[in-house]
Amino acid sequence: MDARISNYVGRVGERGVRVDRHTPWGNPFIVGRDGSRSEVIRTYVRYLASNEDLINRIEELRGERLLCHCRPQRCHAEVLALVANGYRTIEELVELVTQ
């Protein structure tokens, strides 16, 4: 799920919108404690889908540079970028991660 074609996903400290754990967009699931990197990203997809407030605000992220500490590794910010820019619906992503 690499969304760099639509949103640049960078590291905190650059200019952009932070989506790390210090924001409502952050992934509350931790690599190691809650599973592998892929598992916590999949869990985040389901979490996002169940969070009506975030889904209602997702367009705030459209076209923005999303910043998280994970980059350059795979990151939940890629999920946010895909949905915010209309490349995937949250329902499509939930279906993908539950297959």
Segments the model singles out, each with a brief description of its role:
Residues 1-99:
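Catalytic phosphate/metal-binding cores of nucleic-acid and nucleotide-processing enzymes, i.e., regions
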